[in-house]
Amino acid sequence: MSRTVFCQRLKKEGPGLDFQLYPGELGKRIFDNISKEAWTEWQKKQVMLINEKKLNMMNLEHRQLLEKEMVNYLFEAGEVAIDGYTPPSK
């Protein structure tokens, strides 16, 4: 049986993550408050950020930037700004 969480990003109930995907207190916060759907959305944004900004995950500053963007996206209802990207219209 999957667990349900109230997703802080989507502001609705949904299936929670199966396990903690990120270490530490932030990982626990994500596990307890973010749904699978919101996490999948974040992963797509994360890939775009890494590619467009040419981030190197071996570089501490780049990891910190990505973490800051993740917190902003998941918990502060922020959007990820990617230069030159226009989301498809619905």
From Swiss-Prot:
GO terms for cellular component: cytosol. The keyword Calcium does not apply. The keyword Hydrolase does not apply. GO terms for biological process: cellular response to oxidative stress. SUPFAM superfamilies: YggX-like. Gene3D superfamilies: Fe(II) trafficking protein YggX. InterPro entries: Fe_traffick_prot_YggX (IPR007457), Fe_traffick_prot_YggX_sf (IPR036766). GO terms for molecular function: iron ion binding. Keywords: Iron. PANTHER family: FE(2+)-TRAFFICKING PROTEIN-RELATED. NCBIfam families: PRK05408.1 (NF003817). Belongs to the Fe(2+)-trafficking protein family. HAMAP family: Fe_traffic_YggX (MF_00686). Could be a mediator in iron transactions between iron acquisition and iron-requiring processes, such as synthesis and/or repair of Fe-S clusters in biosynthetic enzymes. This is Probable Fe(2+)-trafficking protein.
